[in-house]
């Protein structure tokens, strides 16, 4: 009798838990993009939409999202994160772990490894990832490159950036994505902003901001550091 009761109780609790889990799934868009562009509140303490509504930065990190996932996998991942209540997906265009010459769709990322020659097929894929996220109300916090392309250290590299081509690449990205409704720029990529890196990161950010006045920008430093160490007074840095 006791065993029968226990089994019935377990099945009952399983049904309740399953129902509860289904009810916990968010059914609407992750955010309301119609509230306007994001900005830093005048207090400097939080982010908000241009209509004054506070914005919760609930981010999930998927650095290799653009490089490794195909369209179907991207849709599955973004939908899963929307259901879980995330508002921001953090990812990279030129990522750390995959080769520079091929992506999930079989396209090179750059033609001949030249940062001045972005591969059209790959960046059409980048466009699609941003658009798929926008349709779900998800922001994309986008790194133009991971840090090893500026300062190899423990990464795969190669180091391909100079201040000059970083500015050109940044301006090109700014022109391409300035009207995306769901973008946050992240400069850096687990690297410092000192030494030779300073001029490159500064040029990349300045290039983007020279044409894109619509999106917030921050910096991803290496561990135990803050963007304020190097860029606190930079005109392009909106928040640390």
Residue ranges of model-derived segments:
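Bacterial Sec-dependent N-terminal signal peptides
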Residues: 1-23
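Active-site mouth of glycoside hydrolases
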Residues: 26-239
């Amino acid at each position: 009798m006791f065993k029968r009761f226990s089994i019935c109780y377990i099945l009952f609790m399983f049904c309740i838990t399953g129902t509860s889990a289904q009810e916990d799934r968010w059914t609407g868009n992750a955010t309301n993009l119609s509230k306007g562009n994001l900005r830093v509140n005048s207090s400097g303490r939080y982010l908000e939409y241009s209509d004054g509504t506070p914005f919760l930065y609930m981010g999930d990190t998927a650095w290799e999202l653009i490089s490794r996932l195909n369209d179907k996998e991207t849709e599955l991942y973004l939908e899963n994160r929307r259901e879980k209540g995330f508002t921001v997906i953090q990812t990279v265009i030129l990522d750390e772990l995959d080769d520079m010459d091929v992506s999930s769709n079989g396209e090179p990322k750059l033609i001949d490894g030249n940062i001045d020659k972005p591969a059209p097929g790959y960046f059409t894929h980048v466009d699609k990832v941003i658009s798929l996220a926008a349709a779900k109300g998800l922001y994309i916090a986008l790194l133009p490159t991971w840090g090893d392309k500026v300062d190899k250290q423990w990464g795969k590299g190669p180091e391909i950036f100079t201040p000059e081509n970083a500015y050109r690449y940044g301006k090109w990205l700014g022109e391409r994505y300035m009207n995306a409704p769901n973008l946050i720029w992240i400069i850096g990529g687990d690297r410092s902003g000192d030494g030779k890196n300073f001029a490159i990161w500064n040029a990349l950010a300045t290039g983007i901001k020279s044409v894109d006045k619509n999106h917030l920008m921050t910096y991803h430093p290496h561990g135990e550091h803050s963007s304020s160490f190097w860029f606190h007074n930079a005109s392009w840095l909106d928040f640390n």
